[in-house]
């Protein structure tokens, strides 16, 4: 399975990436498992509150990610 990860705001600064591809042997992976993998790769992300969206839909940690899904890591946004 191959998925696309997109990082925004301070998360892009930490990873020094806007986007990357991840490949897994599994057919699916939970958002929770992906979050753990990302936080072990980019440890400073653990210090930031962020939301995860799967295919442009806000997601909880139990959602299953499938091949070709696009996962966005979104820091808090302010605006008005």
Predicted regions and their residues:
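Ubiquitin-like/PB1-type beta-grasp interaction modules and other compact soluble beta-rich domains
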Residues: 1-78
